[in-house]
Amino acid sequence: LCGLEKLRLGETGRSKLLANLMFGAYNRKFPDARTPNDWICSDPEVVAKYTADPLCGQDATIGLTREMLRGIRMIQRPANLQRMDKALPVFFIAGRSDPVGNMGRGVEKAAAAFRAAGMQDVACKLYDGRHEILNEKDRQLVYDDVLAFYERHLD
């Protein structure tokens, strides 16, 4: 579909069809949504600022969409996971109510796939919140956990 949209709109074109297919369902998880962007954060003030900002909420270009989907397919291939440095520390973090990560289940599945591939140091933590966990009200907890994870791995 990206290829067809690229023919129609070009590499730097923006496709409403692709945007709706990729992001359109996210808000459906929140029946009380007030804006098309409520899936981003549970804090209404953050969502209001995001919605009002002309630099936020733009549809991705067709080229970016295609590359993002290609990257997702690439990392999901078991052979590619096997090539990763097994000693590399990996910390998966996500919002428990993030529809992008299937309400945390997709993130836990990704962490499990890394472990199954033999990665030796994989941590996964879900936080209360939606997609932008660094903009949620308890964001300091996320920052503290990320800092603690990296401090444990500094030589």
Show where each model-derived region lies.
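Catalytic active-site module of serine/aspartate enzymes centered on a nucleophile-bearing elbow/loop
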Residues: 115-155
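Alpha-helical elements of Rossmann-like donor-binding domains used by nucleotide-donor carbohydrate transfer enzymes
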Residues: 67-70, 109, 141, 145
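Active-site nucleophile elbow and catalytic-triad environment of alpha/beta-hydrolase enzymes
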Residues: 60-82
